[in-house]
Regions:
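Gly/Ala-rich beta-loop-alpha elbow adjacent to hydrolase catalytic centers
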Residues: 35-40, 44
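Alpha/beta hydrolase fold serine-hydrolase catalytic domain that processes acyl esters and thioesters
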Residues: 1-33, 46-256
Length: 256
């Protein structure tokens, strides 16, 4: 009866700081770990910061944590009890005003360097093309009305950003663990619908990859990596799959 009342109380208070306080006080012998994925990871980090002063043994782990979340000082000081896990090219852990501005500039510059018709390029997005066949080398693209418009726009944005002052730098919080791809295995046998698929964009012909966990810092995620896996690497099932694989490998090593 007591257990059911406690569960009901927790359910009604779920999501509130006060509710978490009451549950923690009712079960003082329990440890408290706050976890989340994506936006939930960001929420878990903020909630943990609010609770940590009263519960110093609290720990927090975020998977695919949003990139621009805490200032550098707070992010560093929380490293003893807060961990951010990032899978390979996960775009969400690299998102920020600075990285988006940089990506916009790179995309516009790349478009001005295109040799081929843009409609043709869009039709061949999932094909692997030679960059020399598609783009002029940087600085060697011919002058055009579009290129001049892009140059003017980027110069305007640079002046605007300079007049606004330096951006307040925000980084990934806590200790950062990166799950890094170490090798590409053989491609699974492709079905007919995916014969032109580029490097496993489709789930039905995804390559088998090996990952290793490496401790790093938030500075390693200061640019958005444009790749075929940048969105897929954020999916919770991908995190679960690779973490389970690493856990099994660790168990095998420790048993030897």
């Amino acid at each position: 009866m007591r257990e059911s009342r406690a569960s009901a109380s927790f359910g009604s208070d779920r999501g509130s700081v006060d509710g978490t306080y009451r549950v923690a006080q009712a079960y003082p012998h329990y440890g408290l770990t706050v976890v989340g994925h994506s936006l939930g990871a960001g929420t878990a980090v903020i909630l943990s910061l609010l609770l940590h002063a009263e519960y110093p043994t609290l720990s927090c782990c975020g998977f695919g944590t949003p990139g621009s979340l805490l200032d550098r000082k707070t992010a560093s000081e929380s490293g003893n009890w807060l961990t951010s896990v990032v899978l390979d090219n996960d775009i969400i852990s690299r998102l920020g005003l600075g990285t988006l501005n940089h990506l916009r500039e790179e995309v516009l510059r790349s478009i001005t360097r295109a040799k081929l018709n843009k409609t043709y390029i869009m039709r061949t997005l999932v094909e692997e093309l030679d960059a020399d066949d598609v783009m002029y080398p940087a600085g060697e693209e011919p002058s055009s009305e579009f290129k001049n418009a892009v140059d003017s726009f980027l110069e305007h944005m640079r002046r605007k950003n300079e007049s606004a002052g330096k951006l307040h730098e925000l980084v990934l919080p806590g200790r950062v663990i990166a799950l890094v791809k170490t090798s590409w295995g053989q491609m699974h046998q492709m079905r007919g619908c995916c014969e032109s698929c580029f490097r496993g964009v489709c789930c039905c012909c995804r390559s088998k990859k090996a990952y290793v966990a490496q401790e790093t810092t938030g500075d390693a995620f200061s640019e958005i990596v444009v790749s075929s896996s940048m969105a897929l690497d954020h999916f919770p099932d991908r995190y679960a799959e690779e973490l389970q694989t690493l856990s099994r490998k660790w168990e095998e090593v420790t048993r030897r």
